[in-house]
């Protein structure tokens, strides 16, 4: 049986693919207030603006290509049972060829009903304010907005709790729930932080 390697990935892993990180000066929030484009209230208040923001992000991500970091994780599958838990909403891990990817914050390539969270459909193009589910309810990006619960949190905790190795790549681990996931690893798990600007409070062997 292959050792279980759980990868916690964040925006930094996709930076070389041309996708800006959140906190960079030219990052994803540049020119936007979070409360205007990434909250349930914003969607209610100005659906057109929220959809336009995510339509632009979807187009940008579609143009990006997986980089060497994504491809290395695919190679790891030869020797490890690799389980990727990503904070990213693009599909670069999947396009690189990774088999098991869990998206904490949702996926840009999907849309879901504003009324029925289980009604999820592929979305490769732009969303419109006129998009409806079969019952006439408005569709929305399949994204976890600020203030919303993370539907896949329990499966993520379960994966980390079984890990032999945890790789933390491209994330500062400052955003919920990723900042607590690493603590779910078994006591004997090996934990490695791969980040050009590492969190000095993180011990790469024992965790926090």
Swiss-Prot record:
Reactions the enzyme catalyzes: N(6)-acetyl-L-lysyl-[protein] + NAD(+) + H2O = 2''-O-acetyl-ADP-D-ribose + nicotinamide + L-lysyl-[protein]; N(6)-succinyl-L-lysyl-[protein] + NAD(+) + H2O = 2''-O-succinyl-ADP-D-ribose + nicotinamide + L-lysyl-[protein]
Keywords: Cytoplasm, NAD, Transferase
UniProt GO MF annotations: histone deacetylase activity, NAD-dependent; NAD+ binding; protein-malonyllysine demalonylase activity; protein-succinyllysine desuccinylase activity
A Pfam family: SIR2
EC number annotated for this UniProt entry: 2.3.1.286
Compartments, as annotated in UniProt: Cytoplasm
Cellular component GO terms, alphabetical: cytoplasm
Binding sites annotated in the UniProt record for substrate: 54, 57
Top-rank EC class of the record's enzyme: transferase
Entry keyword Transferase: yes
Binding site for NAD(+): 10-29, 87-90, 170-172, 197-199
Domain annotation Deacetylase sirtuin-type: ranges: 1-208
Chief location bin: cytoplasm
Source organism, top-level taxon: Bacteria
Active site positions: 105 (proton acceptor)
Free-text function comment from the UniProt entry: NAD-dependent lysine deacetylase and desuccinylase that specifically removes acetyl and succinyl groups on target proteins. Modulates the activities of several proteins which are inactive in their acylated form.
Domain notes from UniProt: 2 residues (Tyr-54 and Arg-57) present in a large hydrophobic pocket are probably involved in substrate specificity. They are important for desuccinylation activity, but dispensable for deacetylation activity.
Sequence similarity: Belongs to the sirtuin family. Class III subfamily.
Protein name as catalogued: NAD-dependent protein deacylase
Natural source organism: Aggregatibacter actinomycetemcomitans
Lineage: Bacteria, Pseudomonadati, Pseudomonadota, Gammaproteobacteria, Pasteurellales
């Amino acid at each position: 049986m292959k050792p279980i390697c759980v990868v916690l990935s964040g925006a930094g892993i996709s930076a070389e693919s041309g996708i800006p990180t959140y906190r960079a000066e030219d990052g994803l929030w540049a020119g936007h207030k979070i409360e205007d484009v990434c909250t349930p209230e914003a969607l209610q208040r100005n659906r057109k603006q929220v959809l336009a923001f995510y339509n632009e992000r979807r187009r940008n991500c579609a143009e990006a290509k997986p980089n060497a970091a994504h491809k290395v994780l695919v190679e790891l599958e030869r020797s490890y049972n690799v389980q990727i838990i990503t904070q990213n909403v693009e599909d670069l891990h999947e396009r690189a060829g990774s088999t098991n990817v869990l998206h904490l914050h949702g996926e840009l390539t999907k849309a879901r009903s504003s009324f029925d969270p289980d009604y999820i459909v592929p979305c490769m193009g732009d969303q419109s304010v006129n998009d409806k589910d079969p019952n006439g309810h408005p569709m929305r990006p399949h994204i976890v907005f600020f203030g919303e619960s993370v539907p896949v949190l329990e499966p993520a905790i379960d994966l980390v709790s079984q890990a032999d190795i945890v790789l933390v790549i491209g994330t500062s681990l400052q955003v919920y729930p990723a900042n607590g996931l690493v603590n779910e690893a078994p006591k004997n798990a090996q934990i490695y932080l791969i980040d050009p600007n590492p969190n000095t409070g993180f011990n790469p062997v024992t965790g926090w």
